[in-house]
Protein backbone atom coordinates (compact mmCIF):
# COMPACT_ATOMS: atom_id res chain seq x y z
CA UNK A 1 0.00 0.00 0.00
CA UNK A 2 1.29 3.41 -0.92
CA UNK A 3 0.27 6.25 1.32
CA UNK A 4 1.95 8.98 -0.72
CA UNK A 5 -0.68 9.03 -3.47
CA UNK A 6 -2.57 12.30 -3.78
CA UNK A 7 -6.33 12.22 -4.02
CA UNK A 8 -7.53 13.68 -7.31
CA UNK A 9 -11.19 12.65 -7.31
CA UNK A 10 -14.10 14.63 -5.90
CA UNK A 11 -17.72 13.59 -5.88
CA UNK A 12 -21.18 14.97 -5.24
CA UNK A 13 -24.58 13.38 -4.76
CA UNK A 14 -28.09 14.56 -5.45
CA UNK A 15 -30.61 12.64 -3.39
CA UNK A 16 -34.34 12.22 -3.96
CA UNK A 17 -34.33 14.01 -7.31
CA UNK A 18 -37.79 14.08 -8.87
CA UNK A 19 -37.67 12.10 -12.12
CA UNK A 20 -37.06 8.55 -13.23
CA UNK A 21 -33.57 7.08 -13.13
CA UNK A 22 -33.78 5.85 -16.72
CA UNK A 23 -34.48 9.34 -18.05
CA UNK A 24 -31.57 10.75 -16.04
CA UNK A 25 -29.26 7.96 -17.25
CA UNK A 26 -29.78 8.88 -20.92
CA UNK A 27 -28.29 12.30 -20.17
CA UNK A 28 -25.50 10.99 -17.94
CA UNK A 29 -24.43 8.51 -20.64
CA UNK A 30 -23.74 11.42 -22.98
CA UNK A 31 -21.60 13.47 -20.57
CA UNK A 32 -19.64 10.64 -18.93
CA UNK A 33 -15.93 10.82 -19.83
CA UNK A 34 -16.06 14.43 -21.04
CA UNK A 35 -14.36 17.48 -19.62
CA UNK A 36 -16.21 19.79 -17.27
CA UNK A 37 -16.52 22.57 -19.83
CA UNK A 38 -17.77 20.26 -22.60
CA UNK A 39 -20.32 18.70 -20.25
CA UNK A 40 -21.70 22.11 -19.23
CA UNK A 41 -22.11 23.13 -22.87
CA UNK A 42 -23.86 19.86 -23.69
CA UNK A 43 -26.18 20.11 -20.70
CA UNK A 44 -27.13 23.67 -21.57
CA UNK A 45 -28.47 22.72 -24.99
CA UNK A 46 -30.07 19.34 -24.26
CA UNK A 47 -33.89 19.37 -24.39
CA UNK A 48 -34.40 17.23 -21.28
CA UNK A 49 -35.83 18.28 -17.92
CA UNK A 50 -33.24 16.22 -16.03
CA UNK A 51 -30.37 18.47 -17.16
CA UNK A 52 -31.08 21.02 -14.41
CA UNK A 53 -30.46 18.73 -11.40
CA UNK A 54 -27.53 17.08 -13.23
CA UNK A 55 -25.94 20.49 -13.80
CA UNK A 56 -26.43 21.34 -10.13
CA UNK A 57 -24.76 18.11 -8.97
CA UNK A 58 -21.93 18.55 -11.50
CA UNK A 59 -21.22 22.10 -10.31
CA UNK A 60 -21.20 20.83 -6.72
CA UNK A 61 -18.67 18.11 -7.58
CA UNK A 62 -16.40 20.65 -9.28
CA UNK A 63 -16.72 23.01 -6.31
CA UNK A 64 -15.72 20.13 -4.01
CA UNK A 65 -12.67 19.44 -6.18
CA UNK A 66 -11.73 23.11 -6.23
CA UNK A 67 -12.20 23.85 -2.52
CA UNK A 68 -11.29 20.56 -0.86
CA UNK A 69 -8.56 19.29 -3.19
CA UNK A 70 -7.29 22.50 -4.78
CA UNK A 71 -7.81 21.27 -8.35
CA UNK A 72 -8.25 23.54 -11.35
CA UNK A 73 -11.79 23.29 -12.83
CA UNK A 74 -10.45 23.48 -16.39
CA UNK A 75 -8.48 20.25 -15.87
CA UNK A 76 -11.39 18.19 -14.55
CA UNK A 77 -13.07 15.31 -16.33
CA UNK A 78 -16.24 13.41 -15.40
CA UNK A 79 -14.96 9.99 -14.35
CA UNK A 80 -18.19 8.40 -13.10
CA UNK A 81 -21.81 9.45 -13.38
CA UNK A 82 -24.60 7.20 -12.15
CA UNK A 83 -28.31 7.43 -11.46
CA UNK A 84 -29.91 4.96 -9.06
CA UNK A 85 -33.57 4.52 -8.24
CA UNK A 86 -34.89 6.30 -5.19
CA UNK A 87 -38.06 5.61 -3.24
CA UNK A 88 -41.28 6.49 -5.07
CA UNK A 89 -43.47 9.28 -3.76
CA UNK A 90 -46.91 7.79 -3.23
CA UNK A 91 -49.91 9.88 -4.17
CA UNK A 92 -53.58 8.97 -4.59
CA UNK A 93 -56.03 10.09 -7.25
CA UNK A 94 -59.72 10.04 -6.35
CA UNK A 95 -61.82 7.94 -8.70
CA UNK A 96 -65.50 7.18 -9.11
CA UNK A 97 -67.63 5.62 -6.37
CA UNK A 98 -65.21 6.35 -3.53
CA UNK A 99 -62.24 4.53 -4.99
CA UNK A 100 -58.68 5.83 -5.15
CA UNK A 101 -55.89 4.86 -7.54
CA UNK A 102 -52.28 4.95 -6.38
CA UNK A 103 -49.81 7.10 -8.28
CA UNK A 104 -46.10 6.46 -7.81
CA UNK A 105 -43.93 9.43 -8.71
CA UNK A 106 -40.39 8.23 -9.35
CA UNK A 107 -37.30 9.67 -7.67
CA UNK A 108 -33.62 8.97 -8.24
CA UNK A 109 -30.21 9.52 -6.69
CA UNK A 110 -27.55 11.14 -8.91
CA UNK A 111 -23.84 10.59 -8.19
CA UNK A 112 -21.09 12.34 -10.16
CA UNK A 113 -17.32 12.01 -9.65
CA UNK A 114 -14.80 14.30 -11.30
CA UNK A 115 -11.07 13.67 -11.51
CA UNK A 116 -8.06 15.58 -12.75
CA UNK A 117 -6.92 14.74 -16.28
CA UNK A 118 -3.34 13.73 -16.93
CA UNK A 119 -1.97 16.31 -19.37
CA UNK A 120 1.02 14.45 -20.80
CA UNK A 121 2.52 15.50 -24.11
CA UNK A 122 2.94 12.07 -25.70
CA UNK A 123 1.98 13.53 -29.10
CA UNK A 124 5.19 15.56 -29.28
CA UNK A 125 7.50 12.53 -29.03
CA UNK A 126 7.87 11.49 -32.69
UniProtKB/Swiss-Prot annotation:
Pfam families: Ribosomal_L22 (PF00237). Keywords: Ribonucleoprotein, Ribosomal protein, RNA-binding, rRNA-binding. GO terms for molecular function: rRNA binding; structural constituent of ribosome. GO terms for cellular component: cytosolic large ribosomal subunit. It comes from the Bacteria. GO terms for biological process: translation. The keyword Transcription regulation does not apply. Belongs to the universal ribosomal protein uL22 family. This is Large ribosomal subunit protein uL22. The gene is rplV. This protein binds specifically to 23S rRNA; its binding is stimulated by other ribosomal proteins, e.g. L4, L17, and L20. It is important during the early stages of 50S assembly. It makes multiple contacts with different domains of the 23S rRNA in the assembled 50S subunit and ribosome. NCBIfam families: rplV_bact. It comes from Prochlorococcus marinus (strain NATL2A). Part of the 50S ribosomal subunit. InterPro entries: Ribosomal_uL22, Ribosomal_uL22_bac/chlpt-type, Ribosomal_uL22_bac/org-type, Ribosomal_uL22_CS, Ribosomal_uL22_sf.
